[in-house]
Curated annotation (Swiss-Prot):
Keyword tRNA processing recorded: yes
Main location: cytoplasm
Intracellular or extracellular location(s): Cytoplasm
Protein name: tRNA N6-adenosine threonylcarbamoyltransferase
Cofactor info, note text: Binds 1 Fe(2+) ion per subunit.
Main EC class the enzyme belongs to: transferase
Pfam families: TsaD
Gene Ontology annotations of biological process type: tRNA threonylcarbamoyladenosine modification
Entry keyword set: Acyltransferase, Cytoplasm, Iron, Metal-binding, Transferase, tRNA processing
Claim: Acyltransferase is one of the keywords in the record: yes
Gene3D superfamilies linked to this entry: 3.30.420.40
Reported function: Required for the formation of a threonylcarbamoyl group on adenosine at position 37 (t(6)A37) in tRNAs that read codons beginning with adenine. Is involved in the transfer of the threonylcarbamoyl moiety of threonylcarbamoyl-AMP (TC-AMP) to the N6 group of A37, together with TsaE and TsaB. TsaD likely plays a direct catalytic role in this reaction.
Cofactor(s) required, per the database record: Fe(2+)
Classification lineage: Bacteria, Pseudomonadati, Pseudomonadota, Alphaproteobacteria, Hyphomicrobiales
Amino acid sequence: MRLLGIETSCDETAAAVIEHNIEGNSQILSNIVWSQTDNHAPYGGVVPEIAARAHVEILDDLILKALTDAHTKLKDIDAIAVTSGPGLIGGLLVGVMSAKALSLATGKPFIAVNHLEGHALTAVLTHNVAFPYLLLLVSGGHTQTILVHEVGNYQRLGTTIDDALGEAFDKTAKLLGLPYPGGPALEKAALLGDKNRISLPRPLKGEKRLDFSFSGLKTAVRQAATAMSPLTENDVADIAASFQAAVTDTVYDRVHLALQYFTHQYPLSHYKGRRPPALVVAGGVAANQAIRLTLQELAHQHGFEFIAPPLSLCTDNAAMIAFAGAQKFARGEKNSFDIAPRSRWPLDEKAAPLIGTGRRGTKA
């Protein structure tokens, strides 16, 4: 069967076509992503209204290109999967309404996909990773460790109680006067800096809870930058390097605990003679090489296989949405048109609220 996937949850507009067979294997036939980076660069961050308007302007063309590149006609599509949350509500509305319109016009099933589930299952698409596995999802909007038991069964072990890691990277980069997008710019600056020059906190390090926190680190960076003002290029590089070192230390500590939790539930002795369990990283921040190397080392220490999907599939894309939709469709799941997009949509909605959920409910 062939599925069309649509993704408009933030500042990438994407459409893709995949082919999914009865054995459960999938092939990406097309995967088109249009980035809005240039639209948002003058503002130093994503502007929701601009993002939504950009989705409206380009989505139809991207869907057509995805179908053309896949040598597929709309009538040959078996189902339409679309990100329905979490994300920016304006962008989600564009994608969901487009998918519903196509579904209504063609009679093809409509499938609402959780954006986080798309990230969670990407390693199954790219590496055929076996269940269960541990996922670290790090992006501009999310920082979570998730125990992926099987399709549809996700246990969130820890989440950020304030800023997501990608958000912390971008805001720190902006504070240092680095260009947007901030994550890659800060990583580049850090290569030239002294990571030991500035003492920065490692939030929650050593605590038994599995959550993350980055707002205090961001505040410490601001205080250091203010004390050193005006900043030279060397100052910026040293602050960037010190910040990145603090982040990697924090990630190491948090994921180390999550791996211990995993092996308590699924002892490594069960994997003797089999492929070891996997530590998977996904999300835009997975492009950071310092974090990747830290996770690779950590996985090796714990006897895990380290898996990082290609960067094009770590960041937001529609192939992962089509694949997640295929899993649901293969199990007979589809949605009615009365489903609405959700700005917040945790993978484990039935779980007890975590610390830091805020007045608006559990962080997605």
